[in-house]
Curated annotation (Swiss-Prot):
Coiled coil: none annotated. InterPro entries: G3P_acylTferase_PlsY. Keywords: Cell inner membrane, Cell membrane, Lipid biosynthesis, Lipid metabolism, Membrane, Phospholipid biosynthesis, Phospholipid metabolism, Transferase, Transmembrane, Transmembrane helix. It is a multi-pass membrane protein. The gene is plsY. Catalyzes the transfer of an acyl group from acyl-phosphate (acyl-PO(4)) to glycerol-3-phosphate (G3P) to form lysophosphatidic acid (LPA). This enzyme utilizes acyl-phosphate as fatty acyl donor, but not acyl-CoA or acyl-ACP. It is an enzyme of class 2 (transferase). The chain crosses the membrane at residues 10-30, 59-79, 87-107, 116-136, 160-180. It catalyses: an acyl phosphate + sn-glycerol 3-phosphate = a 1-acyl-sn-glycero-3-phosphate + phosphate. It comes from Ruegeria pomeroyi (strain ATCC 700808 / DSM 15171 / DSS-3) (Silicibacter pomeroyi). Its main location: membrane. This is Glycerol-3-phosphate acyltransferase. It comes from the Bacteria. Probably interacts with PlsX. The lineage of its organism: Bacteria, Pseudomonadati, Pseudomonadota, Alphaproteobacteria, Rhodobacterales. Pathway: Lipid metabolism; phospholipid metabolism.
Length: 203
């Protein structure tokens, strides 16, 4: 019988917990609870904050942002408290994967931006704050939500080095690549100059 208190088993345990937390589809739950229908049939069909905003309910969008970010932060903080820093990083990655590929929705989830920001706020708050500001700046200057997300992700490894948080550098690269992968359709539209601006209907 395997020992469940070994380092490897603890990392697996926190990966499962992180995935479970990350896979909670708050955007879908909130829009259904508020009588707005199935979010997957609205706008882009994405379950994240930007698509919730397309319903016209800014409160629901703000709450989705906080909850999707919060689940990433909670996964990190719980893992760190009970199992240390390695487990926190594993839980962070698992929470991000859970949001993007939730088993409950046939592995069709969001793009992970809010969860990305939340987990960095918990892992290394100076990096998290810098990424949030980068996200806001990118979105404010371009008026394109996906551009803010890409700027935040691309800048994260820079902030990790600049703010002396190098322990998370490998995780930062992996998460950045995953954010870009999840936004590959947006990147194609950005190149074609057809990506909708904030407030516009999704193409």
């Amino acid at each position: 019988m395997p020992a469940f208190d070994t380092p490897a088993m603890m990392l697996i345990l926190w990966a499962v917990i992180g995935y479970g937390l990350g896979s909670i589809p708050f955007g879908l739950i909130l829009t259904r609870a508020m009588g707005m229908g199935d979010l997957r049939q609205i706008g882009s069909g994405n379950i994240g904050t930007t698509n919730v905003l397309r319903t016209g309910n800014k409160g629901a969008a703000a709450l989705t942002l906080l909850l999707d970010g919060g689940k990433g932060a909670v996964a990190v903080l719980l893992a760190r408290a009970f199992a240390g820093e390695d487990a926190a990083q594993v839980a962070a990655l698992a929470a991000f994967v859970g949001h993007c590929y939730p088993i409950w929705l046939g592995f069709k989830g969001g793009k992970g931006v809010a969860t990305f920001l939340g987990l960095w706020l918990a892992l290394a708050w100076p990096v998290g704050v810098a990424c949030c500001l980068s996200w806001l700046a990118g979105a404010a200057v371009t008026r394109i939500s996906s551009m803010g997300a890409l700027v935040a992700a691309a800048s994260s490894t820079f902030w990790l080095v600049l703010l002396d948080q190098g322990a998370g550098f490998v995780l930062g690269i992996v998460l950045t690549l995953m954010v870009f992968w999840r936004h590959r359709a947006n990147i194609a539209r950005l190149k074609a100059r057809t990506e909708p601006k904030i407030g516009q209907k999704s193409a």
